[in-house]
Amino acid sequence: MPNLRQMEIVTDVDKLNVDLQATLMKYRTIKQWAYIVHDKDDTRAHYHIYLNFGTSSVNTALVASWFQIPENFINKVKGRKTDMLLYLTHGNDSQRNKHQYDTKEVIANFDFETEITNASIIGDRKSVV
């Protein structure tokens, strides 16, 4: 039950039994969020949900209760925020062999495309999505 400032939720679409949009907007502790449905991979349709709590740390068990999912569906974000955001579209170099999702498929409470473009400009990425 760690406390984290940012985390990722990965869950099959049919396992998420809450209104995702309403849940994301309900908790003001979540400063930034972005999600996508990966439904063109070679696996079952699943969500990748990015959560950022700003300067606060939030317990993963609490977040699991918000989304009514097991806590083990929540992962610590490894690497930089940009790496996590790029993974949503399989934009990382290591994900080039997977389906490339359009940035317009990502739903976020911030300008996702600008965030990715700015990361490219400052050198976090070799090419723009």
Where do the PLM segments sit?
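Short, glycine- and small/hydrophobic-rich beta-strand elements in well-ordered beta-sheets
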Residues: 29-41
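Extracellular, beta-strand-rich glycan-interacting domains
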Residues: 50-52
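Catalytic "initiation/cleavage/transfer" segments centered on a nucleophilic residue
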Residues: 1-27, 54-129
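A broad, low-specificity signal marking well-ordered, structured residues that form hydrophobic/aromatic
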Residues: 7, 33-34, 47, 72
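The conserved glycine-aromatic submotif of the RRM
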Residues: 41-48
